[in-house]
Amino acid sequence: MDSIYLHLGCGDRKFDGFVNIDAMPGADMQLDLTQPLPWQQGSVSGIYSEHFIEHITQAQAIRLLHECRRILQPGGVVRIATPDLAQVVADYTNRYTHPEYLRFGMDWIDNPGEQLNMAMHWWGHQWLYDEEELSRIGRMVGLNVKARCKIGESTDPIFRGREHRALSGLIIEFEKPDRRLKADDQPLVTIAIPAYNPTFFRQALESALSQTHTNLEVLICDDCPGKDIKKILSEYQKVDKRIRYLKNPAKTAGKNFGRDNYMRCYREARGEFIKFLNDDDLLARNCVQRMLAAFTLADDITLVTSRRQPIDENGDYLPDVGATEAPVAEDAIIEGLSLGEHILTKGKNIIGEPTSVLFRKLELADVRPDPMSMDGKPLMGVSDLAMWLHLMAKGSAIYLVEPLSFFRRHKNQVQQVHGAAMHDLAQQGWAVLQYAWKRWGLMI
């Protein structure tokens, strides 16, 4: 298949070997670049754009970069050249007028304030970027920052010498990572148990240790006020070196309904992949193996989940409730933004609790202040859903209809003991999640 290279917002400049795209007549293709791009997933080798992204809103830019990631082949690059907000502000502070303004006949500029407002608002500018902001929105939608480049320079010959605007002070090359596992890969998976209640801990631990995928780290971060968890664990540590135990400081134990314990599990995990396991839940023996196999099926998978079977205190099956019913009749790849919008519109977490999901640790490393946050706000009550939404913005999900986890309902669950408080926190969290995704243009 011939390589496809796109030149977005080409204006009157056409590149040989590229599909030159603009809204104006004369381009190879006339397209509205704020709408979905008409290329199949993983079909494009590279994308170039100079002095276009600042002419659309932040939300439209996020969607455009999401589309670029979708259509790029793994390893493909999108190169964005745009004015540098940091330089614009420095010019204002230093009372410097760039020669480019004079070249275009703007010798009448009177003062730095006038020049700054021109940079922000003239020529249809809607949103200017510095390196931090442009890098952030690229990572948000699943692209990796490959390099910040100087004008005309690139490690890829096809992008060299392309810039023609002296004010292209910010040039970033993003790369689409290769997320697909090879069939014979055996990555290290951390099964992370944020332990607190010892009642069902032994059963949870045994379900982790009995996994058919054996390249495991079983990490226990212990929030239990006493020594019950450690005592149970000592029996297993003697015979299984995959177990790693961390006792949380007494001053943080149980804090924020266990949220801090989840985040310690995340930080301490050594595996490429993380599989949370609540101390009262269970995993099917083939859970990790089946979920890893799903990562071999497509390029853009960031999250694998499955149906979870509700059980009672004795391990007996309970009937499904709305959120635990399988949303599909057979195993399915579900596009991330579509799934996220469905969840936020319906108000139902069909992906599941932390026990339900397998994901790469690195995918959430850029979320601040931590992966259970959204829009900079640490969340409780829907903290797991915050993680899933970040992952869905970066790629697609796979839902497996086989029940690979067992979600235990009992009277001592946090949701039961602190029901009213958890409900209020969840309601606040849903509002934060919905507002963020709407503001970023990730849902209508």
How does the language model describe each region?
Residues S3-A90, I172-P177:
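Conserved SAM-binding loop
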Residues Q60-R63, E67, Q73, V77-R179:
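S-adenosyl-L-methionine-dependent methyltransferase catalytic module, highlighting the catalytic core
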Residues R179-L209:
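N-proximal low-complexity "stem/linker" segments adjacent to membrane-targeting elements
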Residues I191, T324-A420:
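Conserved nucleotide-sugar donor-binding catalytic segment
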Residues A204, P249-A269:
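Glycine-rich, basic loop-to-helix element that forms the pyrophosphate-binding segment
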Residues E206-T252:
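Acidic donor-binding segment of Leloir-type glycosyltransferases
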Residues I274:
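Short aromatic/hydrophobic "clamp" motif used to bind/position activated sugar donors
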Residues N286-E325:
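Conserved donor NDP-sugar-binding/catalytic core segment of glycosyltransferases
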